[in-house]
Amino acid sequence: MYRKVKAYILENEMIQENAWVLAGVSGGGDSMTMLHMLLRLRQELGFSLRVVHVHHGIRGEEADRDAAMVEKICGQWGVPFICRRFDVPSLALSWKCGTEEAGRMVRQKAFQEEAALLNTDNYQIALAHNQDDLAETLLFHLSRGSGIRGLASMRPVVGKVIRPLLCLRRQEIDHYLKENEIFYVTDSTNLTDDYTRNKIRHKILPEIEKELNPKAGEHMAKTAQILSMAEDYFTRKGREMLDRCKKEEQGILIGMEIFQEDPLIVSYGIMEAFYLLSSRRRDFSAVHVQSVLSLAKNQAGSCCSLPYRLMGIRKYEGVWIGKQTEQEKRQLFFHEEWEIFPGKKADTLLGTFETRIFLYQGEKIPEKKYTKWLDYDKIKNK
């Protein structure tokens, strides 16, 4: 198994010579296996190692136990240890997002800040995702509805992020832990089926492997790799399309002639325009791409709102995507009013809306960015 991971790291050129590796270690079996292997590889591949543990301030004494355990093991193994503490529930309220999203953001912040302290660009951030995580992520995105990018989202190398264990199944990791007598902790939230990913992990994927194919998870991982290659190709073509568009200070103008070309390439070009203007890929989806494509078929003056204060406007010569000004905001929000009836979908300039009225019986309110529950008794002028 050690040789397998070493070969995978070399094959994907994950770690450069004399690099720093910041290993994200939660204390769970996956991250402890990764840390143990990186320690063995440190001398062979010639890199420096540092552990970053993120305390989310969610699980109370259990989270304190995890941090203390990782710090103790790092002391025994001679690895520098950094613990970053955040109050994720409070940050989630402040940032108006779910705790899972806030947790992702603070982890990213922790790694970025620790990397900045290294004063070198020769570093990697090692995460302990395995092949089962890859299969579960593919199933998760597939069930929610996703394009190629979502289905191919977990790769061995993405920028500074590396995933050395992506070649291993979870059962291989369990075997390595026992064989090397590595102590680890178990996050109690991973044992429940309260989260969609846990249901996929504990019920759906095992059932698929039991009833259909025992290597289904492995095949899904290979499919994700193929989709990654397709994603790279279409992204490259989208950038080539964007190179032929007119760049302006506040936006990008996509000429009408471009909308006559391959729609998939045009869609990728639009996604690259979103990234160029916002420096973000998250929160942009096929819905926003379709909104821009629809503008090409509308009359001049039509517009749509996009994430991160961007908007699209139909002009005579094409579709402009750029940052909202005060004048453009007024054009967008005071364009017209819409009636949205319960149980039916309504396509508006702001996107597609659907409403539903139901009796609340104490269910857990979902923390989703585009799904909101409103108390009917508190709505005025209803």
Predicted features, each with a name:
Residues 1-206:
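Core alpha/beta nucleotide-donor-binding catalytic domains of modification enzymes
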Residues 2-29, 48-50, 54, 86, ...:
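AMP-forming adenylation/ATP pyrophosphatase catalytic core
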Residues 124, 130-297:
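Flexible helical/loop "lid" subdomain adjacent to adenine-nucleotide binding pockets
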